[in-house]
């Protein structure tokens, strides 16, 4: 099976996902850029609209003028046609009258006949005008056909040059967005190879706390939840959007029936999962109904600062969500203080499976899950980096060296959001985001 290895924005192989011969578009798979965005290589036609903006604008203006002239000529032709019909009927009437006068030459008085004859003599010059009018009408019809042909030729030139109108460009952009979305879906899971520079969203609250979005919500749902402090807190603020969170507006308050401990909370599919204060109980609180749906003890889990992260703060239990579901990271006496990773059933909170990583929890600054891999940091130190990874699919580990900038020197919450492929952190009263770069292995469609 042929595989494409990709990391960052470098492509070591090429796989055409989409191709449009008539437009010249080709779209290739790629990986995430350092800022965390999915990047796909698009090969565009050689004749780019950007290089022809001036001529395209002139062409559009010329087409508009031709269309205006064409419309004016159509109106003129319609009016001319009506006038021509009237003149032709008058011509017929004149000839009929002239014939009748000639036939009635002997039956009318000389005076009356002379008067009618003089009137007919006055009308005779109109015959030549009528002939010219008919000739002009034929010219108008011919010109209208030429303008119509010119308009068609200009439209063909416009299409060849790529001078598309706004609606056409909008449709093309939407189609390309759909292609890029399919590219992102194809990338899927990967191994962490880089963490971006920090992006400070806001400075709010005390030194310790947590903030998060729902990892299972649709893209249109951008609510943000904010929980200040690391023990005995009960107040959760829900902001309508990230913009509202930045401005500190449009929020509602939830008052939890039981206080929390630590900062390892997570929002998953409309519910908050947190550690009940002074216990090893996991609580699932549903925001919409404002009620606790289920709570359950985590067997043997330490609590009340028995096995916290190196920074303390009642961080005995840390809940996480990645592409595969809900996880709990904690420690038991049976595991001698080493980190235990457990997969939880989000409905019942029962442990589905557990792994002993062999890594002492008190030596870790923070941890997060990506694609079933637990990444451990020394974020309590100045030269912060991700330096340990445990793979649940193979029950194996390795030491890594992925540095990142600990801008405010005290990270008390670090969690991965698979929907946004970003790390949410609370750093010394600052709410901060990091984008991640993943190393992908993509199987070519159709390969065995």
From Swiss-Prot:
Residues 188-440 form the Olfactomedin-like domain. Glycans are attached at residues 68, 149, 269, 304, 393, 435. Keywords: Coiled coil, Cytoplasm, Disulfide bond, Glycoprotein, Membrane, Nucleus, Secreted, Signal, Synapse. This is Noelin-2. The keyword NAD does not apply. The keyword Ubl conjugation does not apply. PROSITE patterns: OLF (PS51132). Residues 1-14 form the signal peptide. Disruption phenotype: No gross abnormalities with normal lifespan but mutants display reduced exploration, locomotion and olfactory sensitivity, reduced amplitude of the first negative wave in the visual evoked potential test, abnormal motor coordination, anxiety-related behavior and changes in AMPAR complex composition. SMART domains: OLF. Disulfide bonds join 189-371. Involved in transforming growth factor beta (TGF-beta)-induced smooth muscle differentiation. TGF-beta induces expression and nuclear translocation of OLFM2 where it binds to SRF, causing its dissociation from the transcriptional repressor HEY2/HERP1 and facilitating binding of SRF to target genes. Plays a role in AMPAR complex organization. Is a regulator of vascular smooth-muscle cell (SMC) phenotypic switching, that acts by promoting RUNX2 and inhibiting MYOCD binding to SRF. Residues 52-79, 130-187 form a coiled coil. InterPro entries: Noelin_dom, Olfac-like_dom, Olfactomedin-like_domain.
């Amino acid at each position: 099976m042929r595989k494409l290895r990709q990391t960052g924005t470098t492509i070591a192989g090429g796989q055409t996902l989409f191709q449009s011969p008539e437009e010249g578009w080709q779209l290739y798979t790629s990986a995430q850029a350092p800022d965390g965005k999915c990047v796909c290589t698009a090969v565009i036609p050689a004749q780019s609209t950007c290089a022809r903006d001036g001529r395209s604008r002139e062409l559009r203006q010329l087409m508009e003028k031709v269309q205006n002239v064409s419309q004016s000529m159509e109106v003129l032709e319609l009016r001319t046609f009506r006038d021509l019909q009237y003149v032709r009927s008058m011509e017929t009437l004149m000839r009929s009258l002239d014939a009748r006068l000639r036939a009635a030459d002997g039956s009318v008085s000389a005076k009356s006949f002379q008067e009618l004859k003089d009137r007919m003599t006055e009308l005779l010059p109109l015959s030549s005008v009528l002939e010219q009018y008919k000739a002009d009408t034929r010219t108008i019809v011919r010109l209208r056909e030429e303008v119509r042909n010119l308009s068609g030729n200009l439209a063909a030139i416009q299409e060849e040059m790529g001078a598309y109108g706004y609606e056409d460009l909008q449709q093309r952009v939407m189609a390309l967005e759909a292609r890029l979305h399919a590219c992102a879906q194809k990338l899927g899971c990967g191994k962490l190879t880089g963490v971006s520079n920090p992006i400070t969203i806001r400075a709010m609250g005390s030194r310790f706390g947590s903030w998060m979005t729902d990892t299972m919500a649709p893209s249109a749902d951008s609510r943000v939840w904010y929980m200040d402090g690391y023990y005995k807190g009960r107040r959760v603020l829900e902001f309508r959007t990230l913009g509202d969170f930045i401005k500190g507006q449009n929020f509602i308050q939830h008052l939890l029936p039981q206080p929390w401990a630590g900062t390892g909370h997570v929002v998953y599919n409309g519910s908050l999962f947190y550690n009940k204060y002074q216990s090893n109980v996991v609580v699932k609180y549903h925001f919409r109904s404002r009620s606790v749906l289920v709570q359950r003890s985590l067997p043997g889990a330490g609590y009340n600062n028995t096995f916290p992260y190196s920074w303390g703060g009642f961080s005995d239990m840390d809940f996480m969500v990645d592409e595969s579901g809900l996880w709990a990271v904690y420690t038991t006496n049976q595991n001698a203080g080493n980190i235990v990773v457990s997969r939880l059933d989000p409905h019942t909170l029962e442990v589905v499976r557990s792994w002993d990583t062999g890594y002492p929890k008190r030596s870790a600054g923070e941890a997060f899950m990506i694609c079933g891999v637990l990444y451990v940091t020394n974020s309590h130190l100045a030269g912060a980096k991700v330096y340990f990874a445990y793979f649940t699919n193979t029950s194996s580990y390795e030491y890594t060296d992925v540095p990142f900038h600990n801008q405010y020197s005290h990270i008390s919450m670090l969690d991965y959001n698979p929907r946004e492929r970003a790390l949410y952190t609370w750093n010394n009263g600052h709410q901060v985001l990091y984008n991640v770069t993943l190393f992908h292995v993509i199987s070519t469609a159709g390969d065995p």
